[in-house]
C-alpha cells in the first residue's frame, strides 16, 4: 500500500484541535501521526507532549517545514514574537536547500470561502515569507482547508492549494485576494509535485479525481524572482463612469526595471491597450487616468495589466472589479450673462461659456 511504500508527512488542521476537551487537546491526531520534533516541547503554548504541531526536516533538495497557523484554543501562536514565528524565521534563515516547501492547513491567501478570515496570517506570516523570498529563498507554501485548487503568487512567494478528492463546489468568494490568483478550480482533484534530478525545477500537475490534467506550472530557480502586479482599482464596486477612471495598482519588482502595460476588455481575454511602458517604481507612479468618454461600446469592462522585466515571461494580473462605462446623460449647464445689441447694422450676442467660464462673442 502507499502507506508502507511512500514517505508521508502531515500537518495539523482546524478540526484536529476541536476533538477533545481543553485538558486533552488534539490527542487523536497524535495517536495516528508521528512528526519530527523542532527541538523542544513547548508546554507554554499547549503542544501535545507526544508530538509537535510545527516541525522541519530536509528531504533531498527540499527543506520541508510544517506549520500550525490555526487559531483554535489549543494551537500555538504565530504572532510577532511568538515561539513559532521566531522558529520559522530561524528555519528560513538557515535553510541551504534549493527549495523550501511550507505546509499549513490554513491559507495565507485564498479567494475561496475561508480567505475572508486570514487577516492574522497576512499580518504575521506573509511579511516574513516575502522577506526571505527577497533574500533569494525559493518558497512554495501549501495549504488546505478550502477543499479546492488554487495557485496564487505575491511578492516572490507561491501559494498553492493542491486540491481535495472530495471537493466542495465552493466558488471564489474572497475577492480581496483575487489580484494574486493565477488559477482557481473548485472541482475535486489532487496534485503531484516533482523535483527535477538537478533540483533546479519543480513541476506541479493538477488533476481531477479521474486523473485528467487541468493545470500545470513549472517553478524554476534560474529566472530569479518574478515581478508581480496587483491592480487595486477598480475594486469591485462597479461605479459608473462617464469621463475618466483612475486605475490604481501596486507591484513587486526586485530588479526595479520592469514595465507595466494596462488593457481593457469586454470578455476578459481579448484586450485593447490603454497605456504601455509605465514604470514599476510605485513611489513615482501608482495610478493612471483612463479617458473613457469616447469609448464605444458602453458597458462593463475588465481591466488587466502585465508586468514584464525582460527576463521572465510577462505576468498578467486582473482587477477584481470592472469599470462600468455609461453615457453621460447630464444636460449641459445653460450659458450665463446672455446679452445682445444692435450697432451699425450688426447684431452682437454675448454670453459666458458655462464650461470654461470665459466670455463668448458672435
Regions flagged by a language model, labelled:
Residues 1-89, 93-96, 120, 124-140, ...:
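Extended active-site neighborhood of metal-dependent phosphoesterases/phosphodiesterases
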Residues 166, 208-209, 218-245, 325-341:
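Short, compositionally biased P/S/T/A/G/V-rich stretches that sit at domain boundaries
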Residues 182-232:
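A short C-terminal boundary segment appended to hydrolase-like catalytic domains
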Residues 205, 302-306:
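Extracellular recognition modules
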Residues 248-256, 309, 353-359:
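Extracellular acidic, Ser/Thr/Pro-rich low-complexity tracts
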Residues 294-299:
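Surface-exposed, short loops/turns at beta-strand junctions within beta-sandwich domains
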Residues 308-314:
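Short, solvent-exposed loop/turn segments at the edges of extracellular beta-sandwich modules
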Residues 328-360:
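Pro/Thr/Ser/Gly-rich low-complexity, intrinsically disordered linker/stalk tracts
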Amino acid at each position: 500500500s502507499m502507506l508502507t511504500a511512500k514517505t508521508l508527512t502531515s500537518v495539523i488542521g482546524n478540526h484536529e484541535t476541536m476533538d477533545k476537551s481543553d485538558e486533552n487537546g488534539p490527542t487523536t491526531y497524535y495517536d495516528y501521526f508521528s512528526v519530527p520534533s523542532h527541538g523542544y516541547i513547548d508546554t507554554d503554548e499547549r503542544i501535545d507532549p507526544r508530538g509537535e504541531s510545527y516541525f522541519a526536516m530536509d528531504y533531498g533538495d527540499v527543506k520541508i517545514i510544517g506549520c500550525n497557523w490555526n487559531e483554535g484554543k489549543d494551537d500555538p501562536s504565530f504572532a510577532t514574537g511568538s515561539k513559532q514565528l521566531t522558529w520559522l524565521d530561524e528555519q528560513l534563515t538557515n535553510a541551504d536547500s534549493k527549495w523550501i516547501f511550507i505546509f499549513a492547513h490554513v491559507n495565507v491567501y485564498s479567494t475561496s470561502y475561508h480567505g475572508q478570515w486570514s487577516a492574522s496570517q497576512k499580518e504575521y506570516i506573509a511579511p516574513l515569507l516575502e522577506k526571505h523570498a527577497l533574500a533569494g529563498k525559493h518558497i512554495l507554501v501549501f495549504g488546505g482547508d478550502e477543499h479546492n485548487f488554487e495557485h496564487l503568487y505575491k511578492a516572490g512567494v507561491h501559494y498553492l492549494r493542491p486540491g481535495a478528492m472530495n471537493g466542495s463546489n465552493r466558488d471564489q468568494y474572497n475577492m480581496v485576494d483575487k489580484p494574486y490568483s493565477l488559477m482557481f478550480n473548485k472541482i475535486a482533484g489532487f496534485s503531484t509535485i516533482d523535483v527535477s534530478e538537478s533540483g533546479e525545477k519543480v513541476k506541479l500537475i493538477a488533476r481531477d479525481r479521474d486523473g485528467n490534467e487541468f493545470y500545470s506550472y513549472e517553478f524554476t530557480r534560474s529566472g530569479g524572482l518574478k515581478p508581480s502586479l496587483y491592480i487595486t482599482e477598480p475594486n469591485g464596486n462597479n461605479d459608473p463612469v462617464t469621463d475618466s477612471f483612475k486605475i490604481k495598482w501596486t507591484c513587486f519588482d526586485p530588479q526595479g526595471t520592469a514595465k507595466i502595460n494596462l488593457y481593457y476588455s469586454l470578455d476578459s481575454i481579448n484586450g485593447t491597450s490603454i497605456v504601455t511602458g509605465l514604470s514599476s517604481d510605485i513611489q513615482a507612479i501608482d495610478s493612471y487616468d483612463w479617458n473613457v468618454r469616447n469609448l464605444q461600446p458602453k458597458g462593463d469592462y475588465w481591466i488587466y495589466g502585465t508586468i514584464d522585466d525582460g527576463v521572465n515571461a510577462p505576468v498578467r494580473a486582473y482587477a477584481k472589479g470592472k469599470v462600468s462605462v455609461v453615457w453621460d446623460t447630464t444636460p449641459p449647464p445653460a450659458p450665463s450673462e446672455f446679452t445682445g445689441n444692435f450697432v451699425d447694422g450688426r447684431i452682437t450676442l454675448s454670453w459666458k461659456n458655462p464650461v470654461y467660464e470665459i466670455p463668448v462673442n458672435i
